[in-house]
A protein has these predicted regions:
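Intrinsically disordered, low-complexity repeat and linker tracts
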Residues: 189-212
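Tryptophan-paired
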Residues: 16-25, 30-32, 37-188, 208-211
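Short helix/strand-capping turn motifs
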Residues: 1-11
Length: 212
């Protein structure tokens, strides 16, 4: 769903006597999505001595009491004159919400689905890379997993990725935190990129980006 709450529209500025004039003076409401989109991507270093040929993600868990049981459909009201420039529209009407008390459990990723690449670090987001360019590159070259749509929350999103270096091996885990920072966790692409370096060490990189 998409929405926006706009106030102080000067109706007189958008009135015309002709159809052509009306087109030039139309009212444009910049809508935003009411949810965010969470992606996971995984890659592993190639090479005979990389020791990543058997790694796999066994499960992913996002902590309990992170997401409200309900959230506002509309972001905060905003003046028409400034709404179009605000790409971080959000709702601050949290009050004291109740939160989902259970873990969000996501599937693991088998070894065959973890992209083998020469340099996993090359798939971190570049300093000048736009959000859309990065998403296009990751979807094309790495491939995403466990796409999830999330309610807006005023909390950081925390969780763990569990993995094994070999079939039947010890299950290890790595924590991640996607910060809220008071900004919109609505209308956002939330990306967690996990990559296995030489020896099987799992490193994580995460991004909060505009959802174009």
């Amino acid at each position: 769903p998409i929405s926006r709450a706009i106030t102080n529209i000067a109706i007189a500025d958008h009135v015309a006597d002709t159809e052509a004039g009306a087109k030039r003076k139309g009212i444009s409401i910049p809508l935003v999505r009411t949810v965010s989109k969470l992606h996971f991507y995984f890659a592993r270093k190639t090479g005979e001595d990389a020791m990543t040929e058997n790694v796999k993600v066994t499960r992913i868990e996002i902590d309990e009491n992170i997401f409200p049981t309900a959230s506002y459909v509309f972001p905060d009201e905003e003046d028409y004159a400034t709404a179009d420039a605000n790409k971080a529209a959000t709702s601050n009407k949290y009050g004291t919400p109740s939160y989902v008390p259970t873990l969000l459990k996501l599937d693991g990723v088998e070894n065959a689905q973890i992209k083998a690449v020469a340099d996993p670090l090359a798939y971190q987001r570049g300093s000048s890379e736009t959000a859309q360019a990065y998403m296009d590159r990751m979807n094309k070259d790495i491939g995403g997993h466990n796409l999830s749509y999330l309610r807006e929350t005023n909390k950081s999103i925390t969780g763990k990725i569990y993995y094994q270096l070999a079939e039947g091996g010890i299950e290890k885990s790595q924590e991640f935190t996607i910060p809220s920072s008071g900004n919109a966790i609505r209308n956002r692409e939330l990306v967690v990129y996990g990559y296995f370096l030489q020896g099987g060490a799992l490193c994580l990189d995460w991004q909060v980006m505009p959802w174009n």
